[in-house]
Curated annotation (Swiss-Prot):
Keywords: Iron. Monomer. GO terms for biological process: cellular response to oxidative stress. Signal peptide: none annotated. The keyword Repressor does not apply. This is Probable Fe(2+)-trafficking protein.
């Protein structure tokens, strides 16, 4: 059974997460405020960041960078900027 939340990223009611996807206080906030659709958008950006910046999830500094980018993207409205990347035109 799905739950509906007000997604602070999309600024509308949307389907919420089925369970907490990320640990700690940030994870609780994501569970309560970020929809599945918004989370999917973040996962796409996260994958680009990991690949383009050659981040290693074994490296604590890389994980901290990724977490900060996630908070900026989901809660502060800042887009992820990757040097040399130009989004495809619609």
């Amino acid at each position: 059974m799905s739950r509906t939340i007000f997604c602070t990223f999309l600024k509308k009611d949307a389907e919420g997460q089925d369970f907490q996807l990320y640990p700690g206080e940030i994870g609780k906030r994501i569970y309560n405020e970020i929809s599945k659709e918004a989370w999917s958008q973040w996962i796409t950006k996260q994958t680009m960041l990991i690949n383009e910046k050659k981040l290693s999830m074994m490296n604590i500094e890389d994980r901290k960078l990724l977490e900060q980018e996630m908070v900026n993207f989901l809660f502060e409205g800042q887009d992820v900027h990757i040097a040399g990347y130009t989004p495809p035109s619609k």
